[in-house]
C-alpha cells in the first residue's frame, strides 16, 4: 500500500524556495540534521547534515551623509512634491516613482592583485534611517554602499519548531572570515 506522501517522496522534486525557505521546508519535512529534527519533534525522513549549513550572503556597509543647499529624493515623496511626482509619472513616466532604488553602480577591486572585481559600490541621492530602508530620512541626504561579491563567511538556517509559519533562526555570521573583514574595510575606504 502506498500513501500520497510516499508517492511524492518517490518522485524527483526540485525545491526552489530560496536560501532561507528551502532549508526550512526541508527541515520541517523531515530532511536535515537529525539533532535539529529530533529537537523539534519531527520524524526523520533523511538525516542530511548539510541542510541549512553554508549560508552565504552579501554583507553591505552603507554610509550616509547630509547635504545643504541641494534637493535629494528624500524631500520628494511628501506632501505637494509627492503629488507633483505622481502627476509627472502618469503624464510621461518620468518621475522619482520610475527610478530604481540605486542610481549608480560600479564594480571595484579591493586589492589591485585580484583579477576579478570583489566589490560592488552603489550611490543613491537619498538616505534611510539607520536599520530601515522602508522609509526615507526627512533631511536631504545621500547613501553610498559597498557589497562584497564573493563572501567567505559561512552562516546557517535552522527551524525553531515544526510550525511552517514560524520564521526560522538565521545566523549569517557576517564578517566572520578575515578576508570578508578586509574587503569591507577596503570598500569603506
Give the role of each language-model region:
Residues 1-5, 9:
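Single conserved hydrophobic/aromatic residue that forms the stacking wall/gate
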Residues 12, 23, 33-137:
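Mid-to-C-terminal "cap/lid" subdomains and adjacent gly/pro-rich loops that border
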Residues 10-28:
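Short hydrophobic core segments
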Residues 31, 56, 60, 68, ...:
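Short capping/connector residues at structural and topological boundaries
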